[in-house]
Amino acid sequence: MKKSLFAGATLTALFSGHALANEPLTLVLDWYINPDHAPIMVAEQIGAFKAQGLDVRIVPPSDPALPPRMVAARQADLAITYQPQVHFFADEGLPLVRVGTLINSPLNTVIALDKQIKTPADLQGKKVGYSVSGIEQATLATMAQHAGIDPASIKLVNVNFQLTSALLAGQVDAVIGGYRNIEAQELKLQGKTPVVMNVEDYGVPAYDELVIVAHRDAIHEAKISKFLTALQAGVGYLRAHPQKSWEAFAAAHPELRTELNHQAWLQTVPLFATDPAALDKARYETYEQFLYNNKLVKKVTPLTNYAVQLH
């Protein structure tokens, strides 16, 4: 009798434990952990993922090009990427769909240290450093046209992701591709007074800098929607407690406790999407047309093929 009771209790415990186990979800970041990922880190800090019944594994990539392709291959549930890349993936026919937004404004800027450069019109005859061909060239050309100058009058110099150092060394007069919350802050901490031109202020359609993609066949899985709910809780807590959440983040990642990361954390707080699930359809369609007009995609892909709003 006792043996039967013990066996029954053991089975009950096993089944109860199984029922209470959190569902695993793998999220691959776009880059190493940094302040741009604050709501994700905060959601983890405050237990928002566990409250949704999720066991979220946050993975920095070995190669920044891999995360979306890992999702396309069903090797991860979600990946952080950039809205422009989502359009390129759709053009390639990859089964990736934007399901959420982390940062819902561009971070890209043109930055100059020369006091004579105040607007894109002042870039005529100047050297501008860049790192990513195609999209940054089209962005700069649009800004130049908006300012009434010939894009060909600007000399582009590939600085291989050394934007700040190229600017400080005087190799270029300005750079495009620096983030307003990172490179601009880095220059200020070095005692410089950078001129920062936000791309969306000069004719470039606004877009979401960082977004979350899932495999097309998985977008209606409950855990995707639960992740977004937890992420929204992370954003809310971060907004209410920016300094407290920074201290918790820095304690968990002491190697990232620098003044630059602290300033970037605080500067980025207002830029996170209040509702990560919300989709601005017109914004995506306008940016798709922008890419097509600049011959960066072969065709105009219908929005429903690459972006959804789950709740």
Residue ranges and their predicted role:
Residues 17-21:
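Sec/Tat signal peptide C-region and signal peptidase I cleavage site
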Residues 7-16:
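Bacterial N-terminal signal peptides
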Residues 1-7:
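Bacterial N-terminal signal peptides that target proteins for export
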Residues 48-51, 146-151, 190-192, 222, ...:
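Short helix-capping segments at alpha-helix termini
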Residues 84-85, 162-252:
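Pocket-lining segment of extracytoplasmic ligand-binding domains
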Residues 288-311:
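C-terminal solvent-exposed extensions
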Residues 220-296:
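Secondary-structure end/capping motifs
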Residues 24-159, 164-169, 173-181, 196, ...:
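Short, glycine-/small- and polar/acidic-enriched structural segments
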